[in-house]
């Protein structure tokens, strides 16, 4: 079964310079799981004959049936580099054996939260791109996430077999395709990265450096320029030079790699390289990449697929490929697979690329520490993370929960950043809401067991030092989704993950048999644990709501809930979309509210944000934790706020981080600081449940203009001020032309040219609009990009397929919030219907409350 034991893995875990934590990320159906198979089979876990078909990391039954990856799965591999290859590693190393912790992640945008969880615990990423369809929208999303987490990418061009067999491209066309993909990826990296001066240095990918692989996961072959450079160096060396030492050889190979890509040409007549495209005699020269690398591959494909027996035999002998006796009788595709797999095994090429170019925890934690750790950059925990010190205090981040075979229990899955985690160790378990010095969200408990994750299997292990990925048993009751585990008393939390999608689609669920309600509640708790993205909410009306990223995501969640977590039959409502409330103009009057005892008065106005500010707050560019002056400067420069006002921001809301702002622009009010907390509490309450239909507010700035307070402290307590503040905020919203915002998907559709018309028809029916269409160069495919309201997206995929004969593939990503046109007070408009439906669903009074309820007269 496995070629190496847990003891061997444990021995390597201590050599932290020889660990690689990496995840495989890509657009949906570009072949991540298939490619992972070639790596796994190299480590001897599945038979090489089955690699490419097993999809070992798709552990769930529904993953195998649907042929998609849903959860990210971890697996540890052992790989030994040869003496010659070790010279290519530019960072510190310790022996020739490497431990590679690989996480296969899903490509569907609905599961992109799983990708985020995978990225947090890894330092490098293998970005897989289908060389036929190129860089797609999801490739860009996951790559952007990786770069934001300071994770170093290497690229793999997958599905080369399709380019050769289906599209029948010429070598030069294929080179141009590759060149274009490399450029596209580098554009994304340079747009979102920190440049060469950043802490990571240059992370651009470049075939010359060997950070780009080419191959086919399904057929199990792959190469980087390094493999071919080595063949040619050996070939030229055989012609007369003596044996080279490993270091000189590495130098020669690196020089050779530079000649194999870009505008370098090869003259077959005299075997010389040249930089011009024409030879001295005026003949057009072939590009080196085409002549020396693609040409042999094309020859093998041609000979085998056209059944040229003698030529095939010659080629096999010339390339020195040793076939098994059973492979010799094959012909056509099976023979092609066997030959290519022998000549350019994918496992070796990729594992070499990973070990040589991706950073070890020692290298990576130096520059990732400031992004990971919330506390001061010089306390013990931070120093331990920076130096990846096994003797430092234990700091471990749990990025997700993995369900066990035992119903209702979970493994906590995460990575040790500093220290050593062992069975029976007593630790502090800190949830995401923990603040140092307080007791809430903190538990002191021993760890029952530490385990090693191996795809479908788990192996018990005594202790695990820093830099490794591990599962823990016995902490699942104390954490919901993520958290920090430490032994250091003054430790702060590891930073919470930022998801690129937000849960905007909701369904209400109830048990078919009312007696099963307790099971449903228990099941919902487990569901919330097992998926990083899902939110389970109980409405005031007693409904149980599940919020997810999209239709597919919710479908999987409900299936899990029914079959695994609650084990009862469930009824579900139609999907509902969350809306946001906002304002479109400044309040037309200064709104006044009096406190219940008539002794205190608040005056406020509301006005909309400038464009882009709400998005900046979502991204974390502007936040409550920022340094005051820095934030004021940013707001003044980018959004032309008054600097004095920008410095007097009281808070953000809802939840202290949301996209609404409360500013104090009063002049010389007595006792103002005493009521600040009460006004802030009222503001959090009002922005969480807006005036129109109790949805969150978004993009509203409230200004406190004036406050008159009673001189006696007893008459201006929280009970007087909080409700007053809320009424005043509602009044200022209702006088500022309130509007509803709806979430919008960005849809990317790939299709052949002849069905583009059908797509336009479907989008127009669903209030969508196309903003870009382009042809994928070198293929007959078109890419259409459009905006589509989430509300209209249910059943969109099925509709699209039936109108285009199943030739169009849509991919929906939540993109932005957009104002629903129309006035909610006008009974015939769309927003007023939405408000009425939402209020009815939530069990509120009919109709938007009248302004008189909130506005007082002097």
Curated annotation (Swiss-Prot):
The modification N6-succinyllysine is found at residues 152, 272, 572. PROSITE patterns: G_TR_1, G_TR_2. There is a cross-link at residues 322, 529 (Glycyl lysine isopeptide (Lys-Gly) (interchain with G-Cter in SUMO)). Gene3D superfamilies: 3.30.230.10, 3.30.70.240, Elongation Factor G (Translational Gtpase), domain 3, P-loop containing nucleotide triphosphate hydrolases, Translation factors. Residues 17-362 form the tr-type G domain. Its EC number is 3.6.5.-. The modification Diphthamide is found at residue 715. One of its GO terms (cellular component) is ribosome. The keyword Chaperone does not apply. GO terms for biological process: cellular response to brain-derived neurotrophic factor stimulus; glial cell proliferation; hematopoietic progenitor cell differentiation; positive regulation of cytoplasmic translation; positive regulation of translation; response to endoplasmic reticulum stress; response to estradiol; response to ethanol. GTP binds at residues 26-33, 158-161, 216-218. The modification Phosphotyrosine is found at residues 265, 373. The modification Phosphoserine is found at residues 325, 502, 595. The modification N6,N6,N6-trimethyllysine is found at residue 525. SUPFAM superfamilies: EF-G C-terminal domain-like, P-loop containing nucleoside triphosphate hydrolases, Ribosomal protein S5 domain 2-like, Translation proteins. GO terms for molecular function: 5S rRNA binding; actin filament binding; cadherin binding; GTP binding; GTPase activity; lncRNA binding; p53 binding; protein kinase binding. It catalyses: GTP + H2O = GDP + phosphate + H(+). It comes from the Eukaryota. Disulfide bonds: none annotated. Belongs to the TRAFAC class translation factor GTPase superfamily. Classic translation factor GTPase family. EF-G/EF-2 subfamily. PANTHER family: ELONGATION FACTOR 2, TRANSLATION ELONGATION FACTOR-RELATED. Catalyzes the GTP-dependent ribosomal translocation step during translation elongation. During this step, the ribosome changes from the pre-translocational (PRE) to the post-translocational (POST) state as the newly formed A-site-bound peptidyl-tRNA and P-site-bound deacylated tRNA move to the P and E sites, respectively. Catalyzes the coordinated movement of the two tRNA molecules, the mRNA and conformational changes in the ribosome. Binds to 80S ribosomes. Actively translating ribosomes show mutually exclusive binding of eIF5a (EIF5A or EIF5A2) and EEF2/eEF2. Interacts with SERBP1; interaction sequesters EEF2/eEF2 at the A-site of the ribosome, thereby blocking the interaction sites of the mRNA-tRNA complex, promoting ribosome stabilization and hibernation. Interacts with HABP4; interaction takes place at the A-site of hibernating ribosomes and promotes ribosome stabilization. Component of the mRNA surveillance SURF complex, at least composed of ERF1, ERF3 (ERF3A or ERF3B), EEF2, UPF1/RENT1, SMG1, SMG8 and SMG9. This is Elongation factor 2.
